C-alpha cells in the first residue's frame, strides 16, 4: 500500500531540467526576479526555497514564493486555473 503523504525523496520526483538550470542560475547570481515557467507538473525541491517562480495558469503567470512547507508539492497546486464567480442568482428571490 502506498503512503499518500510521501515526500519527494520517497517517490520519483519530476522537474523540468530547463527549470532547474534557471533556478541554479538565479541562485548563483542572487537575482530576485521571478522565474517564468509553464511546467506545472514540476515538483518543488529544496533548491527553490526563497525564490519566486511565476507559474502559468493557462492565462497568465501567477507568482509563487517558495517556502519550505511547499517541498514535495507540484508547482501547479499553487496557481489555480479556474476562477469562481459564484452561482447565478435565483430570479424568484430577486423580484421580492
Curated annotation (Swiss-Prot):
Gene Ontology terms: biological process: ribosomal small subunit assembly; translation
Pfam families found in the cross-reference section: Ribosomal_S19 (PF00203)
Cystine residue pairs: none
SUPFAM superfamilies reported in the protein's UniProt record: Ribosomal protein S19 (SSF54570)
A GO molecular-function descriptor: structural constituent of ribosome
Domain of life of the source: Bacteria
GO cellular component labels: cytoplasm; small ribosomal subunit
TM helices/strands, residue ranges: none
Keywords for the protein's UniProt record, in alphabetical order: Ribonucleoprotein, Ribosomal protein, RNA-binding, rRNA-binding
NCBIfam families, per database record: rpsS_bact (TIGR01050)
Similarity section: Belongs to the universal ribosomal protein uS19 family.
Biological role stated in the UniProt entry: Protein S19 forms a complex with S13 that binds strongly to the 16S ribosomal RNA.
Protein name: Small ribosomal subunit protein uS19
Species this protein is from: Pseudoalteromonas translucida (strain TAC 125)
Recorded name of the encoding gene: rpsS
